[in-house]
């Protein structure tokens, strides 16, 4: 059994990660900004607490309970994700037995065959660009860290990523999208949660990013 704290546990990705981890028998703490609003939608038996990944104090209060700390936050402006990355690293720096950090990132940070980030493509949808830039900055924060905190940055597909079915199947890659025979990169939120919890259990991608798709 792994002790897991999930920041953003009330969100689309975070809530599914909570359920996947809980269903596998792990001890899960769901950190949300409004416990009274989110608790009814999370599994009974999960402890729901007030938590903010952009607060050093909040992270330090919850980190001692965790073997893995998941950052699955959304909303707000593009500064949210790099601010959270810096905060979490600052909070864990120097902590004995600091938990691993699993950051649910942005698929647009992945690279095309020429090595260019997908978010730099002129055809990349404008409505997603701001969040993509913020997630790219968060990845840079993790990559530039040298404080002994182990992190993993998880990329869903760049565009075709929606709530759907849990199949328990996916394939992984590192710097480029994983595509099917038709050239599409697709994954459900439910199977992203499977990939995240698999990574918590197995630790294949330490101090690097990975992506998952069918």
Residue ranges and their predicted role:
Residues 31-36, 52-53:
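N-terminal Rossmann-fold cofactor-binding loop
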Residues 71-104, 133-137, 141:
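NAD(P)-cofactor binding segment of oxidoreductase domains
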Residues 115, 148, 161-168, 199-208:
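Glycine/proline-rich active-site loop of Rossmann-fold NAD(P)-dependent oxidoreductases
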Residues 4-24:
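N-terminal Rossmann NAD(P)H-binding glycine-rich loop of SDR-like oxidoreductase domains
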Residues 140-162:
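Conserved beta-loop-beta element that borders a ligand/cofactor-binding pocket
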């Amino acid at each position: 059994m792994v002790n897991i704290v999930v920041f953003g546990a009330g969100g689309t990705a975070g809530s599914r990660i909570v359920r996947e981890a809980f269903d596998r028998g792990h001890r899960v703490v769901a950190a949300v900004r409004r416990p009274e609003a989110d608790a009814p939608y999370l599994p009974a038996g999960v402890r729901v607490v007030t938590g903010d990944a952009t607060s050093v104090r909040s992270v330090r209060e919850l980190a001692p309970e965790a073997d893995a700390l998941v950052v699955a936050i959304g909303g707000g402006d593009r500064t949210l994700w790099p601010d959270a990355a810096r905060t979490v690293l600052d909070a864990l720096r120097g902590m004995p037995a600091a938990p691993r950090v699993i950051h649910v990132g942005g698929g647009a940070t992945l690279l095309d065959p020429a090595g260019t980030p997908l978010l730099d493509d002129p055809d990349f949808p404008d409505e997603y660009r701001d969040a993509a830039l913020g997630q790219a900055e968060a990845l840079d924060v993790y990559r530039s860290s040298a404080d002994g905190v182990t992190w993993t940055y998880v990329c869903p597909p760049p565009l075709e990523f929606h709530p759907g079915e849990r199949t328990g199947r996916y394939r992984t890659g590192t710097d480029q999208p994983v595509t099917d025979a038709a050239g599409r990169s697709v994954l459900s939120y439910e199977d992203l949660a499977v990939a995240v919890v698999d990574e918590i259990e197995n630790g294949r991608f330490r101090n690097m990013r990975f992506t998952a798709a069918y």
